[in-house]
Amino acid sequence: MEKIKAGIGMLGSGVLQALYPRRCPVCDGIVSRAGEKICLGCMDKPKLLTPPWCMRCGRKTEEGEEYCRDCREREHLFDRGRALYEYDSVAESIYRLKYGGRREYADFYGEQIVEYLGDFIRDMGPDAIVPIPLHRRRRAVRGYNQAELLARAAGDRMSIPVYSRLLVRVRDTAPQKELNREERQNNLKRAFNIPRNDVKL
């Protein structure tokens, strides 16, 4: 019976792959090998961010610098941050994840987050992961929130609960990438609300 169930599962996966083939998160080509999430030829293209990096925000720094200039000059409302890849090596991929309907990319990136940043995340001792929400109008257009997909892909693998309803975006803000530093800070003021829920903070 178990062999039959396994066979049915493999058949189902094969049918899904044929009808909805997985796309490589780098080149966006169809991944031909079953069970793989990225093309063999693209495996080395996403460049992992290597030290030295800022001890506060994770931004790349010069040799011998503990903190980047921004973190030396400004107080931030977070303890620590880390980046996984060099920006230029995944910029087009992340754009397709956010705006091109390639939600399956999140599974690959969630897996990579756990593999390379899992120890860092566990050392922080998080009680939960809270993805930044999209405004309901933007989510309706996009069909999903890429931050939530990434959070679930990583959180499920690490057995960390993901609270996607803890925050609500109450103001449809302008895209951050179009703004300068001061405008970005003002853009997010009063943009979020914490509704009544059963989650204990």
PLM-predicted stretches and their roles:
Residues 1-201:
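Glycine-rich phosphate/pyrophosphate-handling loop used in enzymes and phosphotransfer proteins
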